[in-house]
Amino acid sequence: MALARRLCWCSAKIAGSSKPFASAPCSLPSRRNVCSSPSMRQSCMSAWAIGQYGTNEVLRYSEEIPVPTVSSPSDVMIKVHATSLNPLDVLMRGGYGAKLLKLRRDPLSVMDSGCEFPLVLGRDVSGEVVDCGSEVTHFAPGDEVWAAVPPWKQGSLAEYVTLTEYEVSHKPELLSHTEAASIPYVASTAVSALVNAGGLCRDTSSDKRVLITGGSGGVGTFSIQLLKAWGAHVTVTCSQNAEGLVRGLGADEVVDYTAGDVAEQLGTMEKFDLILDNIGGDTEQQAMGLLKPWAGAKYITLVTPLLLNTDSMGLLDGAVNAGFTLHTKAIQPPGPFVHGSIQLVSLARFSCSSHTLSGLLWTCHFPLGDHSAIEPSSVKLLVSTE
């Protein structure tokens, strides 16, 4: 069954500026030519980046961002043909996960204030390999690839991005770079949640009842199609104006959260085998009473307490508090589920997938260096470097 994905909802206003960044407080690593072609020998590139955390005003277009290096034998350097914006980019611009992500980038500089800047945003990339490490075996210069960029790495709103070969896949030939750039991050998140955490696949999803909260977003819309292709029964919560979208993607039942108490509406339905929560907050407590009382019932949330806790409490206290929170929820399910096993899975990492999709729709894309403002809209913004 061919899968089609409507683009995720991302409201963002980019205030274009070419004001240069202040010098970074930490030294840059030694550089080498990015590839053998003389035209590619450069030390700086164009990119959208931030020099501090804040609102839209901190996002700037610069032509003086250091070109990423191939510093590991397994590295692959990609010339970006297209990228896109995700809600995570907006959160990271404001400092979400800053402490833990800084630790992941460089444990030795975790106490150095501002060492992560300039920080390039962007989690999706579709482009062409221009350079490879000495041990790379699956890719060669000229290969067309796509990838989801981990949040602790420099992003793809730039001319180049460097990843390990294990984070990259060959781009499906039937997709253009613009189409391909709309998929990797939300698709990887959905697959990680449903397959790795939820244990679902083509052979295990038939007749399973799945609830997706916030189902009109990027992860939700991809999950709907994947689950329907596998034969699951899918219920979605969303606003009334998104009902047509999710039904068009295959949702069996839709609950309008603007039409009354969501828990009350869901309480009249048959209980669920799996709940994928894209919202968090009070949704968690509501969801626990909606699971079937059997050992395989699972509640999966994409709203991890780890990053929020480390931001507010510091690395050590935040990590301990998050671990205690997850442990308590996992071993003490409420109400009639005391005799069952309900798993609370908090996804803080995402693994790449190369599922082939077709029939993509997009409504807005613009060149990397376009400084014109993008007004808030219900689209996924696609950025082309071509």
Regions found by a protein language model. Give the residues of each.
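N-terminal chloroplast transit peptides
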Residues: M1-S27
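Cysteine-centered motifs
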Residues: C8-C10, C26, C35, C352, ...
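N-terminal mitochondrial targeting presequences
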Residues: C26-M45
